[in-house]
C-alpha cells in the first residue's frame, strides 16, 4: 500500500538521536497507529513496548533483534518484525525511508 486514506496525522515530529531518526504518527479510524519516517546513516537502538513491523521503503541497513546474535541485512522493499517488550539495533548505511506499524 503506497498511501493511506482517511487518517489523522500528528503535526509534531518524533525526533530521536539528535535528528538522526525522525517520524510522524498516523492514526487510523480504527485507532491503530503507524509512523512514517527517515533514518540517517548511523547506529541506533530502540526498545519496544508492543510488537512492531518495520517496513523499509528505501535504503539499506542491518538489524539485530534482542536475543539473536546475528545481524540481518534489510533493503528497500523488505521488512522485519520485533516482538513486544524487546529491543533492536540498527546499522543504517544509507538514508532510509520506513513505515513502522504497531501490532496488536
Swiss-Prot record:
<dbReference type="GO" id="GO:0047975">
    <property type="term" value="F:guanosine phosphorylase activity"/>
</dbReference>
<dbReference type="InterPro" id="IPR009664">
    <property type="entry name" value="Ppnp"/>
</dbReference>
<dbReference type="GO" id="GO:0009032">
    <property type="term" value="F:thymidine phosphorylase activity"/>
</dbReference>
<dbReference type="Pfam" id="PF06865">
    <property type="entry name" value="Ppnp"/>
</dbReference>
<keyword id="KW-0808">Transferase</keyword>
<comment type="function">
    <text>Catalyzes the phosphorolysis of diverse nucleosides, yielding D-ribose 1-phosphate and the respective free bases. Can use uridine, adenosine, guanosine, cytidine, thymidine, inosine and xanthosine as substrates. Also catalyzes the reverse reactions.</text>
</comment>
<dbReference type="InterPro" id="IPR011051">
    <property type="entry name" value="RmlC_Cupin_sf"/>
</dbReference>
<protein>
    <recommendedName>
        <fullName>Pyrimidine/purine nucleoside phosphorylase</fullName>
        <ecNumber>2.4.2.1</ecNumber>
        <ecNumber>2.4.2.2</ecNumber>
    </recommendedName>
</protein>
<dbReference type="GO" id="GO:0005829">
    <property type="term" value="C:cytosol"/>
</dbReference>
<dbReference type="InterPro" id="IPR014710">
    <property type="entry name" value="RmlC-like_jellyroll"/>
</dbReference>
<dbReference type="GO" id="GO:0004731">
    <property type="term" value="F:purine-nucleoside phosphorylase activity"/>
</dbReference>
<dbReference type="GO" id="GO:0004850">
    <property type="term" value="F:uridine phosphorylase activity"/>
</dbReference>
<comment type="similarity">
    <text>Belongs to the nucleoside phosphorylase PpnP family.</text>
</comment>
<keyword id="KW-0328">Glycosyltransferase</keyword>
